[in-house]
Amino acid sequence: MFKFNEEKGQLKCSFCGKTQDQVRKLVAGPGVYICDECIELCTEIVEEELGSEEEVEFKDVPKPKEIREILDEYVIGQDQAKKSLAVAVYNHYKRINSNSKVDDVELSKSNISMIGPTGSGKTLLAQTLARILNVPFAIADATSLTEAGYVGEDVENILLKLIQAADYDVEKAEKGIIYIDEIDKVARKSENPSITRDVSGEGVQQALLKILEGTVASVPPQGGRKHPHQEFIQIDTTNILFICGGAFDGIEQIIKRRLGQKVIGFGSDNKHEDLEKEALLSKVLPEDLLRFGLIPEFIGRLPIIASLEPLDEKALVEILTKPKNALVKQYRKMLELDDVELVFEDEALTEIAKKAIERKTGARGLRSIIEGIMLDVMFDLPSREDIEKCVITGKTVTDGEPPRLIMKDGTVVNKDKKTSA
């Protein structure tokens, strides 16, 4: 309802009641008016509240034990890696809150490198950390990067992804986390520096150095090379946490050689031949990464090394069932929406884990295996209203037998039926 001054018929501010003659500006809305003074007051209140929220967001960083407990809810195993990441992340944001200096002591930045086989949980750990801390998060693939002047993605595009994840709030992006995957793929081809250009290897490492250490980078908001005349966004990377992950296939041989050289006397080879891959990865040192093909300056920017173990059968079964977002829970929920109870027998879960190990895909391959098993079930069951329960057996996984179906009248279908895939 419009507000008028009864004596003069003037419009009034709906908030403070001042007339249009008493204020400089009166802004009209549908049936309501607000003056310039009230707008200014509202702006101050909103800025104060948002400012205090931002402060809380980064000052109330969970303690390392709390971070690890939350990681345990989503990621199975990898205890040592979780501990390393929890401490590193806590110290990183503690450093930001102290403005990088405590009693004139400058706290240096600690980026992280994660070494572990495919499907061991590197990406999931990084994603979960960002979720715990409620900070912007971006994933980049090192294999798509090339140094400036060559066809491919510029290093600055990594920062653009983070800015986009922060809804173009640069200040928020400057406290985010960037996960660079497949970092082992930009290792140079040999330990010795090459005379020829290595477009996708050493050159990319050199290009990444500055943003890893901390610099003010100019980021093209539309992605760079196709729009040369655009305005650049300035972003300071000093407080961005970089996590670089890779499988580093073959690094265990480098570690083995190093350990073998340090054992004196007979049987030095035999002593280390029995070391499992996981045990070897836990003994990785910066010098091993250097021999693998990372340049010394790049290794220096990643002082914390967290090694992840290959997942065994037991861990894969737990991944299927225990985390909050476990695959079995997800599929069970999907069928529950069609009023069907889904049950995976223990033998079925074990066989799914075995298949993932055979394919050498780790946890990453579990979904595609289950998707193959569940395809016919999820195609047929929504059209049927007579089924109460669907049981996935070991034979369903190994031999492709149809799952056992329990009807609403108690009848069991496919109980003893044996068909090959």
Swiss-Prot record:
Keywords: ATP-binding, Chaperone, Metal-binding, Nucleotide-binding, Zinc
A Pfam match: AAA_2
Any Gene Ontology CC annotation: HslUV protease complex
Residues that, per the record, bind ATP: 117-124
Top-rank taxon: Bacteria
Gene3D superfamilies tied to this protein: 1.10.8.60, ClpX chaperone, C4-type zinc finger domain, P-loop containing nucleotide triphosphate hydrolases
GO biological-process terms attached to the record: cell division; proteolysis involved in protein catabolic process
Residues annotated as binding Zn(2+): 13, 16, 35, 38
Tagged with keyword S-adenosyl-L-methionine: no
Subunit structure: Component of the ClpX-ClpP complex. Forms a hexameric ring that, in the presence of ATP, binds to fourteen ClpP subunits assembled into a disk-like structure with a central cavity, resembling the structure of eukaryotic proteasomes.
Function: ATP-dependent specificity component of the Clp protease. It directs the protease to specific substrates. Can perform chaperone functions in the absence of ClpP.
Protein name as catalogued: ATP-dependent Clp protease ATP-binding subunit ClpX
Gene: clpX
